[in-house]
């Protein structure tokens, strides 16, 4: 039996019911040392680049490059996988889990969930929180 078989066997009703496979965008952006893994295509990325400089680190690795570049994805941090529709993020989630990544989650796959957190009031709060964390270190 291979690792993908093992992964699928663990995807029971309880697993999906608990929501262990996903993470809300607000939670992801507030998670210290988390990674926002953007798996969208080059044309999508060239149209809308997601930086999140005041929140968390962003890695842009198109889905087709994930196998060759998987060592760039930290294993010791929460990884929130993002795409614009949900299909690619789900595939990358399953792939990373099947090769031993433990703390991988599927982020909401739409721009509205992301941009609603970047309005001035919420962005100001994120900047203040990040500054306080840095001063406390």
Residue ranges of model-derived segments:
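Rhodanese-like catalytic fold shared by cysteine-dependent sulfurtransferases
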Residues: 1-34, 39-78, 87-137
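Short, surface-exposed ligand- or partner-binding patches at beta-edge/loop junctions that are enriched
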Residues: 81-83
């Amino acid at each position: 039996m291979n690792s993908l078989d093992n992964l699928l066997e663990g995807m029971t009703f309880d697993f999906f019911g608990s929501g262990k496979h996903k993470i809300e965008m607000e939670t992801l952006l507030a998670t210290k040392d988390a990674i926002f893994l953007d798996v969208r295509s080059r044309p999508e990325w060239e149209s809308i680049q997601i930086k999140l400089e005041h929140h968390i680190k962003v890695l842009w690795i198109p889905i087709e490059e994930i196998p060759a570049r998987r060592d760039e994805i930290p294993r010791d941090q929460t990884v929130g996988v993002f795409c614009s529709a949900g299909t690619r993020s789900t595939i990358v989630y399953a792939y990373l889990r099947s090769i031993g990544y433990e703390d991988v989650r599927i982020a909401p796959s739409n721009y509205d969930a992301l941009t609603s957190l970047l309005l001035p009031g919420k962005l100001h709060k994120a900047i203040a929180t990040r500054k306080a964390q840095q001063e406390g270190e």
